[in-house]
Structures are given as structure tokens and as C-alpha cells.
Amino acid sequence: MALTICTRFTDEYQLFEELGKGAFSVVRRCVKISSGQEYAAKIINTKKLSARDHQKLEREARICRLLKHPNIVRLHDSISEEGFHYLVFDLVTGGELFEDIVAREYYSEADASHCIQQILESVHHCHVNGIVHRDLKPENLLLASKMKGAAVKLADFGLAIEVQGDQQAWFGFAGTPGYLSPEVLRKDPYGKPVDMWACGVILYILLVGYPPFWDEDQHRLYQQIKAGAYDFPSPEWDTVTPEAKDLINKMLTINPSKRITAAEAPKHPWICQRSTVASMMHRQETVECLKKFNARRKLKGAILTTLLVTRNFSAAKSLLNKKPDGVKVNNKTNLASSPKDTGPAPALEPQTTVIHNPVDRNKESTESANTTIEDEDLKARRFGNLSINSIWQPSVGRPQNSEPKQAPNSSVQTCQVINKARKQEIIKVTEQLIESINNGDFEAYAKICDPGLTSFEPEALGNLVEGHDFHRFYFENALSKGNKPVHTILLNPHVHLIGEDAACIAYIRLTQYMDGSGMPRTMQSEETRVWHRRDGKWLNIHFHRSGAPSVPIN
């Protein structure tokens, strides 16, 4: 699609309230003056984009303009002006499908069948037009309106690629970890079947409220997916019909050539004979699990969006977490003992999109998903919110070029060295904070902690504490610079980097001191601290401590 150049957007459209905001863009409601029709206009600040980014915008616009289906968010116009690019989409007001489900009074297998049918129809339309979405997940499944029975709309073609027929090729390691197919993880040629695998994951979640593949460790998560290691555990799956499980099995078939297609799946009895095959029983347990699943996704998204929008877009730092070809950042701090208890809790959350080097087929990534290996010519590039269909929530990044290029080893080594140095920096600032506590130096402590510091700690009896006043009391009444010597050891500190300007550290804290009778004592506590770098300075914004009080009270 040729972009319309030098057309005055404001001559044709009137802008209204803001709907959302990203790093380099803002989304506002607009009305076409000639027709009075409402749309959503994504306004991208092109002054911050490179020539290559402009090409990618044009490619994505071309893909979106090609797709005209009632279950796909449609791009109506693409207008380029000096310094800005305007993308005019359907105004989709119903929010996410998964959020709507948990608000319903009644939800059954038959409802899940109707949902997946619409998703499959949108995917089939993509495939017929030679488009592979590559990033099917709950965040990209929206509802046209808040009316009952509103159509499901597939959104965000930021990772979409164009293919010829049933072409299988290596288009790069791209997608969202929990929804990646085995062939992508094996670095094999792939094509349209990757979307059907993701549909299988989505259908699984629609039926029980948690994902089929989950693990707090990236490598183990990927091993599960490559092995197709999922099951239908009791008791929640006991009430799911065999036909529903059969469709999931056909979608989650490891061999892509034997996987059910987007044309075949709607003909499955569980979908085309829904009224007689799919169960009508209300699935309350699914709704409850889905609430936890949604809550975890939203919390992670809110934290990452804040970090991304406020980060320093320095070209010198861009090697750490460049995202022009990557997408949403991931952190590895959320753990869970069971997907049924708290929803998905792997190190790689299902909503976290990641892209790796498209040609390094033999190397299993040893970094967390927020590390993107890119081409030499991108080394000084900054990342931005370029996904032109991500209207309803800020996101960053774009798809990898389908033409594979080798990422130089020096880039990988440099990234590893910088990450290692930053982890040591987090350990050091944590030690400084602990030292200020041991010394009873509240002034030094306050300089290292954010004024809005939040915490869970034994002294607060399970309550969330905010600010410094709670801790000031202990500094002034239980601690002093003249106290007997206290020595603290941090055992096994583990640092997880969250973008360039945030990190989380977990460790065991051993505190040695002399009690009132002169006897040596040792206390142990387990701590997790979240750090955020602001104006070049690390500040502790949250901590969680269990075990004994942090400092002995004489």
C-alpha cells in the first residue's frame, strides 16, 4: 500500500480525547468530517524513527489494509505528514475478550466454542491472503463493542509476515513465549501452522483459565513446548467434553504438517455442531482462574509500560535491550507453584513478546526474553512504540526483517558484559542500603529509597507499608550510630534485569551481632528488592522480607 504523502490529516479528520499512549505515539478518538464516522487515530512521532522503521510501518500498514474481515481490526487510512504519521483504525470499544469473559454471569464450553470460531475465521482470512500473524494471544483478541454478543476482533499485526502459499521458511525467532510453536523453538522453517498452535494454547486457556505450558525457567518452558508436554488434569478437565480435548490435541500437534489448519478447524464437530456437542454447563472455576490469569497479565503490563515510557532512550545504552525488532520486555521474577493457583507464572509470561536472532539456529538462548540479539547496523538504534495496531495498550517494537542477517559475536559479548556489570551494580547498591540500616543512618537510607517506597515485612504484621515514616521510627528508637557492631552477609544474590532502568534482586540475609549478654547471635531473613534508576541514580521502590526482623533490637 502506497502511503499518502503530504495530505493534511486535520483536513479530513477531527481529533478528540486521548485513548492511549505509547513511547513514540498517542491514540486519540477521531471523527471523519465528511461522514461523521468515529475511528481511532494512532499518531506516531516519525522524527524519532529511522528510515528502516518507516519501511516497516509501511509494510505493516500494507498488511493491515489488505485484511478486510469482520473479526479483524481494520486499518482505514494511512496519512504521512511532516514529523507525524497517522493511522486510522476501527474504533474498538469492547476491551479484551478475556476481560469480558470474567465479567459474564454465565460462561460455558459453548461460549468458548463461539469465541474460538471467530478467532479461527480471522486467522483463516489472514492465511488465505498469505499473512501469518505470529503473535496470537489474549492481548490481541478484542471485542468490537460492549454490547452482548459483540464480535471478537483480532488486532496487532506488528509481527505479521507475508508468505507465498504454504511456504515454510525461517522468518526469525519471533512471538510470545507461552504461545511459541515447537518448530519456531527448534529454529526450523515455519509458516501458517504457527498460528494454529497459538490457537490451541488460547483454546486451552478459554476452557480452564490457565495455560498448557508454564514454568518459571525459560529453558524448561521451551522444552515443554518442543515436547508437547501438556495434559488435561483433574478435576477441572473432567467436565470438559472429549470433543473439545480432541480439537486442542489437533491444534497442539508437534508436527506442523499434521496440525489442523485454519480451514479445517471450523469444521470440527465441537465448533460446527456446537449446540449438540459442546457442554452448556457454567464453568465457574474457569472464570475464577481466568480472573487470576488476567490480573497477572495486567500487573505485569502496567509495570513494564511505566518502565518503558520513562526509560532513557540513549543510543549508547540501546544495545542492552534494543526493541525496534523486538517487542515487549519480560522479567523473570514471578514464580508459581501451580498454574491453577495463580494463573501463568513462568519466567516468560505469556503476554511477553520476544524476538531473537533469525539465523543463529544452533544456539539456545541463555538470556531472559528481554535480551534481543540484533544486526550490527541496528546497534545505535533506539526502540519505539511502532506496532501500529496496538491501539488499546502501549507496546514497543516491530517484527524482525524476514531477510536473515548475522548478528556479530561482538554484539552478543558486549551485551553480556554490560548485563553482568549492571547486575554487580544492583548488588553493590543493595549492600549500601543494608549498611545504612546496620549503621542506623536514616539519612543515607532515605537517599537510596524512593519516597513512595512500599514494603511487606514482619514488623508490619502483613500490612503493606508505604513511605519512610514506618522505618524512621525504628531508626530513631531502636537503632543508633553508637550501637554495637552488626555484620550482614548477602547469600546467593540473584539479579533479574527489567529493561535498562529497573531490576529485581532476591537474596538471603544473614545478620551477625552481639546480644545484651555479650553472646554472638545470627538472624536470617529472605528479601526481594525492586530497584528503579531515576536520573542516573538507583532507588529502592519496593521490598518484601520474610523471616526475622532486619536488625537486632537491644
Swiss-Prot record:
It catalyses: L-seryl-[protein] + ATP = O-phospho-L-seryl-[protein] + ADP + H(+); L-threonyl-[protein] + ATP = O-phospho-L-threonyl-[protein] + ADP + H(+). Its EC number is 2.7.11.17. GO terms for cellular component: cytoplasm; neuron projection; postsynaptic density. CAMK2 is composed of four different chains: alpha, beta, gamma, and delta. The different isoforms assemble into homo- or heteromultimeric holoenzymes composed of 8 to 12 subunits. It comes from Danio rerio (Zebrafish). The keyword Translocase does not apply. Residues 13-271 form the Protein kinase domain. Gene3D superfamilies: 3.10.450.50, 6.10.140.620, Phosphorylase Kinase, domain 1, Transferase(Phosphotransferase) domain 1. The modification Phosphoserine is found at S314, S318. Autophosphorylation of CAMK2 plays an important role in the regulation of the kinase activity. Keywords: ATP-binding, Calmodulin-binding, Kinase, Nucleotide-binding, Phosphoprotein, Serine/threonine-protein kinase, Transferase. This is Calcium/calmodulin-dependent protein kinase type II delta 2 chain. Residues 330-340 have a biased composition (Polar residues). It holds the Pfam family CaMKII_AD. Belongs to the protein kinase superfamily. CAMK Ser/Thr protein kinase family. CaMK subfamily. GO terms for molecular function: ATP binding; calcium/calmodulin-dependent protein kinase activity; calmodulin binding; protein serine kinase activity. The active site is at D135 (proton acceptor). CaM-kinase II (CAMK2) is a prominent kinase in the central nervous system. GO terms for biological process: regulation of neuronal synaptic plasticity; regulation of protein localization to plasma membrane. InterPro entries: Ca/CaM-dep_prot_kinase-assoc, Kinase-like_dom_sf, NTF2-like_dom_sf, Prot_kinase_dom, Protein_kinase_ATP_BS, Ser/Thr_kinase_AS. ATP binds at L19, G20, K21, G22, A23, F24, S25, V26, V27, K42. PANTHER family: SERINE/THREONINE-PROTEIN KINASE. SMART domains: S_TKc. First detected at 18 hpf. At 24 hpf, expressed in discrete anterior locations and along either side of the midline. At 48 hpf, expression is predominantly in the forebrain, and then accumulates in the forebrain, hindbrain, and retinal epithelium at 72 hpf. Residues 324-375, 392-413 are annotated as: Disordered. The modification Phosphothreonine is found at T286, T372.
